[in-house]
Amino acid sequence: EDIPQNAVVLMKRFRKPEFRTLGEQVKDQLCREFYNQIVGERLNDFIQEEDALFLSAQAGVHDIVRHYEGQNIAITPLPGMEKEAVRQVLEQLERIHRYAITDQKLKELTDNYRLGLKQSAAMLRRMPNSVYLKVYQDHFLLGYPLAEVAEKLDAAWHLLDSIDSRAVHAWLDRWNAGDLNRIYAVLGNNPDYPFPDSESLTRLLREARQSSPAPYVQAVADTLPSLMDFTPVAGRIVKTKRLKGPGAEEWTLSNGAKVYYKHNDYESGAFNLLAGSPGGRSLLPAEDLPSADALNTLFLQYGLYKYPARLLNAIMRGHNIDINIDLGERSESISCSSTRDDAEIAFQFFHLTVV
């Protein structure tokens, strides 16, 4: 039986302070980015580890128009559990605000952010046009100070040490108090469905602020396990062929797979891996298409191998690895990008994803 996809959305609009310097704007943006990341991780943890009364929940702060930004809370509740689901999410947000924004967590996030800044700085002369376009869009549409990409990267690098729990809580206090400029939206196909009204949602917001949520308990062990605790069966290259046109090599592996390898100096010390095969959605029966549509969204949300998401995140902390999957109409693929220093764990991650 299909689960009705009703949804409840709570929105709040608020005015953004005037930024007189690039540093003020970048610091505000960093606080917002780290806050959104903490909220997303904690809500995902709650869905995986607790008796959640909702199928999904997203919450975060985003730009709206010039001088304004807003908080969006979108909840897909279990059927008939709209009020209970909203109460759960709002109480979890209150718990996050009180206990999840810590110096330790922000140190983890800022360390990972530095890795991204190093990557961006390495390709500064090869930035795509879309990056420069966004600089002008942010200036003219959002009122951000106009600055070169290098200036933004440098400002972010030097401001990361100032992003601690006090800074993020100060940013949070700027907009979180009060209920002005709130909008509620309920979505569903049945006009007779008993959705919660605005009075009920406002009451739930106020009750959540007055609640007494429990602090978080650190469940991850002090000594983290290795990502891969076994040695996979080794393959071998049985044939090598030089491809003159693209200046690459074609390797045939012992399992019949073809590998195309090309070295370049586009980003020194970085590598990209793409694996694909024909097939895709076109080979799936109709009843499996809804699950296929959710594949990209749910990828790694519940962990990998024998590790739940929270432990997996702890194991991968500090490693600069990006893995994505794509299920097209007639093909499927998985891509991995990383650096020389993280090559071994990147290939372990890739192996566990595909086997």
Segments (PLM) and residue ranges:
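Short, solvent-exposed polar/charged micro-motifs at secondary-structure junctions
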Residues: E1, D192-D197, S335-S337
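M16 family metallopeptidases and their MPP-like homologs
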Residues: P4-K27, L43-S162, L180-G188, Y260, ...
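Long, His/Glu/Asp-enriched segments that create or flank divalent metal/ion-associated functional microenvironments
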Residues: D28, R32-N36, L243-G247
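Noncatalytic, helix-rich "gating/capping" subdomain that lines the substrate-entry/channel surface
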Residues: F34, I38-V39, A74
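C-terminal regions of mature proteins
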Residues: K107-K244, A248-T252
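A short acidic/small-residue loop/turn micro-motif
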Residues: G245, Y266-E267
